């Protein structure tokens, strides 16, 4: 029994050791013991800096003083003045607007006069747009079937108008020739027969007259 009690005491001791280790692992300090990251370094270089902040070195001047944020901003602004002088100014259009306003004010409410070159340059894109539209309009109209029909109708009417006087003159000439040709065609035979009959009768009459004259002369 003594041995069993000794073993139990040993086990309790071992379990207490593990429990203490577990308690040490699970211990959490008070909130005041933990510093927020934003407050690190605010106390100055005298305070102990955490180990993970050892890689970061504070910016120092030539005199060895720590540079604050405000001083750093001021120094950056002072150094940037030289760069701004080297860079080209970006406020040129604003000056132009002020000049235009001053011109309008100096003319006592009269509208500003535009230069001839400026007016010509302003009018050119408008004219080009109109020409462009007219060209596109002509192209589009040529593709439309209705416009094609109108063109065909206009062309045919012009052709007919041009051909009407010729047709009238041709019809008149044809009528006149037909009138002249009708007696030659259908009635031509009758006239020719009459003429031939007249020619045949005339020599008979002449022969009769000559015979009568001869008889009268013989009687005398």
Swiss-Prot record:
Keywords: Cytoplasm, Growth regulation. Residues 127-136, 172-184 have a biased composition (Basic residues). One of its GO terms (biological process) is establishment of vesicle localization. One of its GO terms (cellular component) is cytoplasm. It is found in: Cytoplasm. Residues 61-77, 209-220 have a biased composition (Polar residues). Residues 39-220 are annotated as: Disordered. Over-expression of RIC3 in tobacco germinating pollen induces depolarized pollen tube growth. Interacts with ARAC11/ROP1. This is CRIB domain-containing protein RIC3.
């Amino acid at each position: 029994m003594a041995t069993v009690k000794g073993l139990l005491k040993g086990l309790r001791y071992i379990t207490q050791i593990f429990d203490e280790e577990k308690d040490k692992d699970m211990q959490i300090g008070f909130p005041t013991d933990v510093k927020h990251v934003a407050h690190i370094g605010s106390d100055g270089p005298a305070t102990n800096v955490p180990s993970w902040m050892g890689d970061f070195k504070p910016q120092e001047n030539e005199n060895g003083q720590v540079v604050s944020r405000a001083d750093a901003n001021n120094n950056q602004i002072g150094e940037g003045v030289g760069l701004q002088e080297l860079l080209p100014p970006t406020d040129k259009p604003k000056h132009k607007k002020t000049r235009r306003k001053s011109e309008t004010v100096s003319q006592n409410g009269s509208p500003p006069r535009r230069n001839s070159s400026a007016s010509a340059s302003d009018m050119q894109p408008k004219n080009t747009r109109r020409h462009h539209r007219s060209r596109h309009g002509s192209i589009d109209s040529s593709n439309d079937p209705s416009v094609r029909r109108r063109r065909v109708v206009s062309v045919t009417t012009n052709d007919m108008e041009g051909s009407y006087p010729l047709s009238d003159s041709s019809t008149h000439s044809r009528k006149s020739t037909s009138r002249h040709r009708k007696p030659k065609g259908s009635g031509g035979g009758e006239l020719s027969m009459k003429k031939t009959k007249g020619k045949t009768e005339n020599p008979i009459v002449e022969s009769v007259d000559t015979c009568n004259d001869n008889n009268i002369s013989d009687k005398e």
